Every structure is written in structure tokens, then in C-alpha cells.
């Protein structure tokens, strides 16, 4: 096997794509800062029990594992940064007030999430800790939409769901409790025939409710239908009330409801959301409330947040235009060096041509050139 080959679904990021990704990262992190979010940088590697604390079985399967040569304990390469940031809030910062944190970094997956998906997403996200009210959920959703708008995605759909609906149904039926994991999988796939089969022995009320969930999607009127078609259990009523409130708080966003879109069900504790762009079947951003993750670190805190994959976002954007630059000759003369330093301080890209490579441009388009005239270095347009 050639030694330059990489593992399946792992790829180098070349200059044009890398520039798009980095520009996106800077714009989004700067926007997080404007909302008051503090940047944290968790390690790529942690003890496995800490890394998987509060996470579901799916996260365990997605995590690369290895043995620490120093301690002999099992380590994990992070597959998601949410738990790490919750650990920082609960154990290291240990604040009593509301805390807003953001992050960006690579994560690794044992298997890709889709046919052409990378196993090394570049995750970026934000979290609010310490406030259980819907105001925090609404802010996180606003921040996610604003981040995508800055990236160039303005025609998006905010899809709302709530884990409380399914959990209330399951808690009300002993047979359903045994099949919780399977029900979650079938509902996400909207596999109605399989749902009909697995719910055959359930109570009639539970069965009708579970079979109704895949069809309960659409605009805000879905909530009215849900109140009619689902049992009036306290957990369901509370979840539908919260979704109605979040819909009203979403302003002019294009909001839809999908009571079977249960991504993150295993560790989410309340309202969830996914954001879709036209022409793509998979969400470009996901988020929601997960109040119990901090319990694993000895300090339960209300929490809500979202994350996105910068690589995926960059891939959806148009090819970046080549960056304008100034070509300068190679030389160490004081006047030339002074001029180049001044231009770079002013934000100009100045590329000094090495001898024999005067016409190489690569990622940059040199539309101007630095020339010596009458003892002064001046800029002239090319072409």
C-alpha cells in the first residue's frame, strides 16, 4: 500500500478549502464573543470514563479507544466536545451564575455518519449553563441561526422537537419501556411498518400515540394536531407548551415541528432543534437541552447548546475566490523591507518571489506588483 494513502473517510484539507474553513471559524467565534461566550479548548484525549460520562451508547461506539502508556487506563479520542465542555463548567469553573462557553476543534469518529461524511469533523459550538428557562433555549437557537447567516446560509429551516413527548409515552407503558432504544431508532427513521410490529402488544393509547408521531411534522399547527392525537399526559402537555413558546420566541425564523426528529435523544432532556438548508437531507446544525450531563461530574446544571461541523459548512459554500496579493521581488534592502512591512501591517498580502519562481501564484492572485522607481518602491497594477 502506498505510504501516502490515508484511512477511509479521512482527508487532508488543501489550501482553498482550508482558507474557507478558517475564515468561517473566525467569523463564527467572533460572533459568539459578541454574545458574551467565552472560548474554551478541551483536550483531544481524555480518560474514557470521563469522556463518555452522561453520553449514550451511540457515543461509545463512535469513540476511538487506546491504552495510556503511563497509567494503563483506557483513553478515548473525543467524538464530541459537548461532554468535555460540561465537565469544564461543572468541575473546573464551578460558577454559581450563568456561564456561556464556546469551543472549536477536531473530533474523531470510528465510523462516518453518512456515505461521504468525514470521520474527522471540525466541530464548533456554544453552550449556556445555569439557566433552566426557555430564554436560554431561545438564545441558543438565535445564535445558531445567526452563525449560519454569517456563513451565508439565510434560507434555512429551524426544526423543533422535544424528548419529553416520547419519554412521557414510554413511562406510561411498561412494554414500551423495554423497547426504548428500538423505538427511538424506528421513530428517527419514520419506519411505520416496523413501529406497527413492535407496538402490537402495547396499550392502545401508547400504540396510537407512537404511530402518530412520524406524521406529526409541519408548521406550528402540528402542535394543535398533537394535542388532539396524543394522550393528555403531563409530560406531553409540558413539552408541547414549551415548543409553542419557543416557536413564538423564534421571531421571523422559518420554524417547523417534527416530533420524530429525535437526534440526541439519549442525553437530551428537553427541547431539541435541527437546522436544515435547502437541498440537503441532513441537518447542518443540531442542539438542545441536556440538563443531566453535569451530574456525572458531581454538579448537575441546567444546560443547552448547539454544534456544527465547519468542514461540512465550508463544503456547501461556493469555491473561494483567489485572494488578491501584491508581488514583490526578493531582496533584503532596508527600503524594500520597510515598504513590505508597512503593507503587511495595513492588511495587504505581499508575496516575495523567490529567484526563478517569479510567476508562481498558487492560492493567491497577484494583481499588483511592487516596483522601484526613482529610488522609491511603489505599487503598480498588473494586466
From Swiss-Prot:
Entry annotated with the keyword Transport: no
Gene Ontology MF terms: histidine-tRNA ligase activity
InterPro entries per UniProt: aa-tRNA-synth_II/BPL/LPL, HisRS-like_core, HisRS/HisZ, HisZ
Organism domain of life: Bacteria
Any Pfam family: tRNA-synt_His
Pathway of action: Amino-acid biosynthesis; L-histidine biosynthesis; L-histidine from 5-phospho-alpha-D-ribose 1-diphosphate: step 1/9
Protein's UniProt keywords contain Amino-acid biosynthesis: yes
GO biological process: histidyl-tRNA aminoacylation; L-histidine biosynthetic process
Chief location of this protein within or outside the cell: cytoplasm
Subunit structure: Heteromultimer composed of HisG and HisZ subunits.
Family, as annotated: Belongs to the class-II aminoacyl-tRNA synthetase family. HisZ subfamily.
Name of the featured protein: ATP phosphoribosyltransferase regulatory subunit
Taxonomic lineage: Bacteria, Pseudomonadati, Pseudomonadota, Betaproteobacteria, Burkholderiales
Amino acid at each position: 500500500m502506498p505510504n501516502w494513502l490515508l484511512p477511509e473517510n479521512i482527508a487532508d484539507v488543501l489550501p482553498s478549502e482550508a482558507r474557507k474553513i478558517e475564515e468561517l471559524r473566525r467569523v463564527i467565534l467572533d460572533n459568539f464573543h459578541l454574545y458574551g461566550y467565552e472560548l474554551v479548548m478541551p483536550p483531544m484525549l481524555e480518560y474514557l470514563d470521563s469522556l463518555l460520562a452522561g453520553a449514550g451508547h451511540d457515543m461509545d461506539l463512535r469513540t476511538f479507544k487506546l491504552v495510556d502508556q503511563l497509567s494503563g487506563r483506557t483513553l478515548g479520542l473525543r467524538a464530541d466536545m459537548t461532554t468535555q465542555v460540561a465537565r469544564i463548567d461543572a468541575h473546573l469553573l464551578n460558577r454559581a451564575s450563568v456561564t456561556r462557553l464556546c469551543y472549536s476543534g477536531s473530533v474523531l469518529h470510528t465510523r462516518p455518519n453518512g456515505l461521504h461524511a468525514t470521520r474527522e469533523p471540525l466541530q464548533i459550538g456554544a453552550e449556556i449553563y445555569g439557566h433552566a428557562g426557555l430564554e436560554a433555549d431561545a438564545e441558543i437557537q438565535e445564535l445558531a441561526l445567526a452563525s449560519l447567516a454569517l456563513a451565508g446560509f439565510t434560507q434555512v429551516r429551524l426544526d423543533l422537537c422535544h424528548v419529553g413527548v416520547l419519554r412521557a409515552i414510554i413511562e406510561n407503558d411498561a412494554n414500551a419501556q423495554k423497547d426504548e432504544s428500538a423505538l427511538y431508532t424506528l421513530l428517527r427513521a419514520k419506519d411505520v411498518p416496523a413501529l406497527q410490529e413492535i407496538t402490537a402488544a402495547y396499550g392502545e393509547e401508547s400504540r396510537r400515540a407512537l404511530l402518530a408521531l412520524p406524521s406529526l411534522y409541519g408548521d406550528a399547527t402540528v402542535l394543535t394536531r398533537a394535542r388532539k392525537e396524543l394522550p393528555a399526559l403531563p409530560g406531553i402537555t409540558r413539552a408541547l407548551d414549551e415548543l409553542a413558546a419557543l416557536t413564538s420566541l423564534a421571531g421571523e425564523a422559518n420554524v417547523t415541528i417534527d416530533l420524530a426528529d429525535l437526534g440526541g435523544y439519549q442525553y437530551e432532556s428537553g427541547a431539541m432543534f435541527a437546522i436544515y438548508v435547502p437541498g440537503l437531507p441532513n441537518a447542518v446544525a443540531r442542539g438542545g437541552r441536556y440538563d443531566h450531563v453535569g451530574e456525572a461530574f458531581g454538579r448537575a446544571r441546567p444546560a443547552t447548546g448547539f454544534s456544527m461541523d465547519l468542514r461540512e459548512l465550508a463544503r456547501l459554500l461556493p469555491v473561494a475566490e483567489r485572494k488578491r496579493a501584491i508581488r514583490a521581488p526578493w531582496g533584503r534592502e532596508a527600503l524594500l523591507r520597510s515598504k513590505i512591512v508597512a503593507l503587511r501591517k495595513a492588511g495587504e498580502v505581499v508575496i516575495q518571489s523567490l529567484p526563478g519562481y517569479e510567476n508562481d501564484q498558487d492560492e493567491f492572485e497577484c494583481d499588483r506588483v511592487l516596483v522601484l522607481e526613482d529610488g522609491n518602491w511603489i505599487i503598480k497594477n498588473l494586466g
